[in-house]
Amino acid sequence: AGASVCHVDASKGMTAWAKENAALCGISDIRFIVDDCIKFVSREIRRGRKYDGIIMDPPSYGRGPGGEVWKLENELYSLLTLCLDVMSEKPLFFLLNSYTTGLSASCMEYMLGVTVARRFGGKVTASEIGLPVERSGYILPCGASARWER
């Protein structure tokens, strides 16, 4: 309904998989970019492009082309702060998803609160992601998600 979507991932394989999934769903108007997200966002800021929403599912760990180490728990705050400058004046949402064991739902809620909510108002909610274990009825925790909305 008038929205445009841009998918950015440094992995060619993940991007190819996302393209395949979009095609299977009959969605053809997605801009797919294979690039480092930090470099991409920095370029978008210089170009003056703005986004009304961001869905972020960053990796827990990675290595750059020069062997530099990237760990989400060390880099998330700076990534969120960078993304503030690519968001429109009245953004609608920011979704953050992670399977990083050292990053709890409450930590993600706090990070969105002190970055996105501090700048744009709105509210932040977070929850644990889990898989139900049929035999015991318990939930096996496997990640967390947080959402900011206006």
Go through the PLM ranges and name each one.
Residues A3, G26-I30, F120-G122:
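A short helix-to-beta-strand connector/capping loop
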Residues S4-D9:
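Conserved SAM-binding motif I beta-strand of class I
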Residues A10-I55:
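S-adenosyl-L-methionine
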Residues K12-M14, V34, Y51-L82:
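Mobile active-site "lid"/loop adjacent to the S-adenosyl-L-methionine
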Residues E20, K39, S78-D85:
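Alpha-helical scaffolding segments of alpha/beta enzyme cores, especially the outer helices
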Residues R43-I45, P65-G67, S106-C107:
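Short, well-ordered secondary-structure micro-motifs
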Residues M87-E89:
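Helix-to-beta-strand junctions that scaffold the AdoMet/dcAdoMet cofactor pocket
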Residues P91-R150:
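C-terminal catalytic and target-recognition region of SAM-dependent MTase-like enzymes
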